[in-house]
């Protein structure tokens, strides 16, 4: 089997998937150790993708969702390789939209009976005082469509209207989109990896994610922490809470229509909800 890994320069992307060169090289080494022919491609243009199509690999592993094109439309890789008759890893573009749009994902999951934190979206000036806000403080503010902690830091946690307005304006100016405001959940945080295989079925692995404590006494899994890779990962045990965390992640995986693999982040309140 001939396998090719596809990634791109990450500077122009709001989200990177697992597309960093370090991660891609780790995947490349693992595939080669299994005895398969493998190649890593850092693609920048449609021409780069065309060269891959000409080689007709048996499988392409998509480490990013799209290639950003300056002064043009982004090239969504799942669509591109599907249209060219080449098998690809991961989910379709329709499913990947849930990964890019947090509100779309939340509303879809809620319609299917899966709990998410209460939320609303806002732009500067939409609400003029605390009493108008749909949810009471404390709130957590984040970009609508960015991943990898982009735009998230200690100031994302807001407890009063002045701080809310300040962070809202900053995010809106940076991303030019409405801002997502969520109820703040003050419990533990987990990430659940899911792999769905034909040979061995569903594999589910969860770890607890513990960000370092900041100078303000907060533990926020934001952009700085993720870039520095300074969070601690703790093995999740087998208990009633972890069984519920894993079940929630698996339910979300299937209701979102994901295939092959995914990673679901789960935050718990101090009451265990």
Task: Indicate residue ranges for each PLM-predicted region.
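ATP-binding N-terminal substructure of ATP-dependent carboxylate-amine bond-forming enzymes
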Residues: 1-88, 94, 99, 125-130
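Active-site nucleotide/adenylate-binding loops and adjacent lid/helix of ATP-dependent enzymes
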Residues: 2-7, 25, 53, 98-180, ...
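Short loop/edge segments at beta-strand edges and connector loops
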Residues: 42-44, 121-123, 183, 262
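A short, local hydrophobic-aromatic micro-motif
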Residues: 89, 117-118, 204-207, 221, ...
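ATP-dependent carboxylate activation and anion-phosphoryl transfer catalytic cores
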Residues: 110, 238-273
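Phosphate-binding site of ATP-dependent enzymes
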Residues: 161-247, 268-270
């Amino acid at each position: 089997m001939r396998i090719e890994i596809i990634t791109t320069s990450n500077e122009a992307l709001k989200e990177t998937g697992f597309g960093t060169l370090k991660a891609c090289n780790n995947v490349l080494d693992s595939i080669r150790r299994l005895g398969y022919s493998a190649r890593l491609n850092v693609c920048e243009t449609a021409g780069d993708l065309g060269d891959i199509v000409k080689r007709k690999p048996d499988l392409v592993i998509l480490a990013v969702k799209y290639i950003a094109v300056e002064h043009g439309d982004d090239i969504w890789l799942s669509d591109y390789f599907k249209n060219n008759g080449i098998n690809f890893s991961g989910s379709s573009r329709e499913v990947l939209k849930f990964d890019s749009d947090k509100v779309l994902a939340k509303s879809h999951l809620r319609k299917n009976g899966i709990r998410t934190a209460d939320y609303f979206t806002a732009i500067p000036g939409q609400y003029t005082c605390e009493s108008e806000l749909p949810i009471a403080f404390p709130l957590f503010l984040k970009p609508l469509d960015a991943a990898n902690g982009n735009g998230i830091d200690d100031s994302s946690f807001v407890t009063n209207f002045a701080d809310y307005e300040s962070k809202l304006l900053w995010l809106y100016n940076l991303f030019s989109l409405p801002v997502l405001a969520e109820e703040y959940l003050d419990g533990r945080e987990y990430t659940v990896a899911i792999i769905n295989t034909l040979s061995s079925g569903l594999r589910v692995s969860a770890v607890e994610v513990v960000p370092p404590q900041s100078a303000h006494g907060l533990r926020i899994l934001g952009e700085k922490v993720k870039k520095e890779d300074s969070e601690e990962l703790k093995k999740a045990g087998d208990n009633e809470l972890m069984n519920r965390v894993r079940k929630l992640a698996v339910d979300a995986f299937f209701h979102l229509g994901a295939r092959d693999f995914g990673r679901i982040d789960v935050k718990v309140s101090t009451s265990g909800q």
